[in-house]
């Protein structure tokens, strides 16, 4: 960001001067840097631990016959001592309802056949977060309840186009568990409230441009950067409080 020096000098770097959720767009940019000989991709959060040491090869085998794999069956959130489980949820693939149900988890990581990722992949416009929710709901052809705040109005035109794309052959990594390492209260992340920032009648695609590194930038930084900076500062990701939480997790 701006003139800040990278924390990992040997990593691949991009520059951006806009505050927003960049994950899905960064995945697109990163894919272009992966040598073409690799036909499978895995995007995984850096704060999770697998229970099975063979996860890498097992997920690779699943991608021989599937386009998309969620790399776990069960996920657990650990408390700040890393010893107690505060929340447990199943993979979103266990959702039987046709209407989206927050009691299953859509995040932490997704593996893809590279060909399918390039055809469809993630929903790239979730710049207020919930990209995993919106992406997996489309892949699984789930509809949303009448009161659903994770799809702000400005995203709806782009999401309608995304939802019309091909459905993947999708599965989960059976009998595998991952644990999420604690880093601040989930309550502070405002999984619902954050979407109000862009809940307006403007098409998100008309508010954003792509910079020289392939990253999204606000066209009007003076308007949108202060709003998103205030949100990110309020998250307190390193906070040591551990408040009970049972709401959305992505």
Q: What does each model-identified segment do?
A:
Residues 1-38:
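Active-site-proximal specificity loops/subdomain of glycosyltransferases
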Residues 3-8, 55-56, 80-85, 184-186, ...:
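Short aromatic-enriched loop/helix-cap "lid" or pocket-rim segments at secondary-structure transitions
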Residues 15-18, 54, 72-73, 175, ...:
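Residues at the C-termini of beta-strands that transition into short coil/loop
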Residues 37-51, 69:
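Short beta-strand-to-loop acidic/aromatic patch adjacent to the donor-nucleotide binding site
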